[in-house]
């Protein structure tokens, strides 16, 4: 190295350090050779080698979702760059900072149809918050700093393509800087007291209020719960916000639509007033969720979101938790009401049903009993990396979460195969916490080669695989919409043996009588530093479809209700309308 000089790749790594980056995920390649040379000599940033670039991208995105620094993943020019796309799109749709670094042929080979040359930047147009190709070596650290600043400030993915020769070139060591250490904490806008007072007046006059609490209030669960108790308003929450609340809070109705609970899917149509806190319910229009709502109050930190899902009677720009506290301080307390009592009864009826399924002690193994064992043996502050489909749906129903936990997935993009990559990142940043990757066999089939990544880097996690040889969530959808259940079944492998072949510990379990002991042993081995895969061979029993309930005799025949209850083992479930009538109220949704 020439005195007073530094390679552009080494300068780039120094910039990344100012942004808190300690890990780069990826696979080495020729078009990343200058970066790999710099990483080999760097003492602070670890290169975490994955078996597929998509795993690296998703791990980097989930790193930020779990509260870590901006995640960084690299891909070779051409194939590697295309493999990063899933991570880029998940970051974009979940408003998550992420930096994708793309390798590229040397600059003198570009536009010459060289080996693996691809016009890469257009792939990310329209989705990346920053998308550039480095033009010369001195520009490299500056562009990386710009990319990180854009990703963090705009909460999305940034993409940088680097011709490989630039990274080898030397630049002046004082010709660059990184801005990641500068104070940039976002200060929420001051709340508009006029709008707060409007909201308070609306809630004071509401007869059937509901709080719809989104992820914007994930750190304000205690305040939102206190507000719920004070005004006797049940809480609907979004799927990714369950950790904000105590799972057994009597006023929690769960989430609405398909990935949800029965109570939430009923109460949303019965409420006259909705306090929409930090949420962007994507099924609102499709589901006509608020068609019976008379008054709608929305709080959001993003002015674009205000009014997106419903016409507003009070519009509050600001932090959801701060707004909830401001309303809590001013709103009138409410004694127990028929509306509240009906909701508490409905919630308990649903929990009794959940507990019955979870507590079975004999018969074929279902996913419900697996969750029961997890709840029994998981640490109180366990981290859950959750895959999509039935796993998302059922984890929100059956995991007994509290604000001590973290639960993350791909909620809007819903890309299958995200749980295992997420667990890599979660364990890397939280080495002293227990990490569970919970997924179906379809998701595990997409990413199981990276079980060995946990083994290689001593990142012990527990992989829980619900194995029933089908794409269950899609099959269930086809059951409601299609003539044929086509293309949804597949042949499974022995996942325990796959785990063992990668240096992990594998278990296979297919009996209710054995699940508790298997999970207990898996937890014990995990605490001893082992990565574990549990192949839980469950039935193909469909979880109850809360979006198409057939329980109310005013809507369905006696035969249809009987068949529905038998199919879903739901003999004790009662339609919300009957609880309302017990309290002297009439349904607004069912006439």
Swiss-Prot record:
Protein name (Swiss-Prot/TrEMBL): Pyruvate oxidase
Upper lineage is:
Bacteria, Bacillati, Bacillota, Bacilli, Lactobacillales
Catalysed reaction per UniProt? pyruvate + phosphate + O2 + H(+) = acetyl phosphate + H2O2 + CO2
What does the record give as EC number?
1.2.3.3
Q: Which cofactor does it need?
A: FAD; Mg(2+); thiamine diphosphate
Q: Where does Mg(2+) bind?
A: 441, 468, 470
For the region Core, give the residue spans: 1-188
Origin superkingdom? Bacteria
Similarity comment: family membership: Belongs to the TPP enzyme family.
For the region Thiamine pyrophosphate binding, what residue ranges are annotated? 337-591
Quote the record's cofactor note.
Answer: Binds 1 FAD per subunit.
């Amino acid at each position: 190295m020439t005195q007073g000089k530094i390679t552009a790749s080494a300068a780039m790594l120094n910039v990344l350090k100012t942004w808190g980056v300690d890990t780069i995920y990826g696979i080495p390649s020729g078009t990343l050779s200058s970066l790999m040379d710099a990483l080999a000599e760097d003492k602070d940033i670890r290169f975490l080698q994955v078996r597929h670039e998509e795993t690296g991208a998703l791990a980097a995105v989930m790193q930020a979702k779990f509260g870590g620094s901006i995640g960084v993943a690299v891909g070779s020019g051409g194939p590697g760059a295309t493999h990063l796309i899933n991570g880029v799109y998940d970051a974009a749709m979940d408003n998550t900072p992420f930096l994708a670094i793309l390798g590229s042929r040397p600059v003198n080979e570009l536009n010459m149809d060289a080996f693996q040359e691809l016009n890469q930047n257009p792939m990310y147009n329209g989705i990346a918050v920053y998308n550039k190709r480095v033009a010369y070596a001195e520009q490299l650290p500056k562009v990386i700093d710009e990319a990180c600043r854009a990703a963090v400030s705009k909460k999305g993915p940034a993409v940088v393509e680097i011709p490989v020769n630039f990274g080898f070139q030397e630049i002046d060591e004082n010709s660059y800087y990184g801005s990641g250490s500068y104070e940039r904490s976002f200060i929420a806008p001051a709340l508009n007291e006029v709008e707060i007072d409007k909201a308070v007046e609306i809630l004071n006059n509401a007869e059937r209020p509901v709080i719809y609490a989104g992820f914007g209030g994930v750190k304000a669960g205690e305040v939102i719960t206190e507000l719920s108790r004070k005004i006797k308003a049940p809480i609907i929450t979004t799927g990714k916000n369950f950790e904000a609340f105590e799972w057994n809070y009597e006023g929690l109705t769960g989430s609405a639509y398909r990935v949800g609970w029965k109570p939430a899917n009923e109460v949303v149509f019965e409420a006259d007033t909705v306090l929409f806190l930090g949420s962007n319910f994507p099924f609102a229009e499709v589901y006509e969720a608020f068609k019976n709502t008379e008054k709608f109050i929305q709080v959001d930190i993003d002015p674009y979101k205000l009014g997106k899902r419903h016409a507003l009677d009070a519009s509050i720009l600001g932090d959801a938790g701060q707004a909830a506290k401001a309303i809590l301080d001013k709103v009138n307390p409410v004694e127990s009401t028929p509306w509240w009592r009906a909701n508490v009864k409905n919630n308990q009826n649903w929990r009794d049903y959940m507990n019955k399924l979870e507590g079975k002690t004999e018969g074929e193994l279902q996913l419900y009993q697996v969750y029961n064992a997890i709840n029994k043996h998981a640490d109180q502050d366990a981290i859950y990396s959750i895959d999509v489909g039935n796993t998302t749906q059922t984890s929100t129903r059956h995991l007994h979460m509290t604000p001590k936990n973290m639960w993350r997935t791909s909620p809007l993009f819903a890309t299958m195969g995200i749980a295992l990559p997420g667990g890599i990142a979660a364990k890397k940043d939280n080495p002293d916490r227990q990490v569970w990757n919970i997924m179906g066999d379809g998701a595990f089939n997409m990413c199981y080669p990276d079980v060995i990544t946990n083994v290689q880097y001593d990142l012990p996690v527990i992989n829980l695989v619900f194995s029933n040889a089908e794409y269950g969530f899609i099959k269930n959808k086809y059951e409601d919409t299609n003539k044929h259940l086509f293309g949804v079944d597949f042949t499974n492998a022995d996942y325990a043996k796959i785990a063992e072949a990668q240096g992990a510990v594998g278990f296979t379990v297919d009996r209710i009588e054995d699940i508790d002991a298997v999970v207990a042993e898996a937890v014990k081995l995990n605490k001893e530093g082992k990565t574990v895969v549990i192949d839980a061979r469950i039935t193909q029993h469909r979880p109850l479809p809360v979006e198409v309930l057939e329980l109310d005799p005013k809507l369905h025949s006696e035969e249809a209700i009987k068949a529905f209850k038998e199919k879903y083992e739901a003999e004790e479930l009662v339609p919300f309308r009957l609880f309302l009538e017990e309290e002297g109220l009439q349904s607004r949704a069912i006439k």
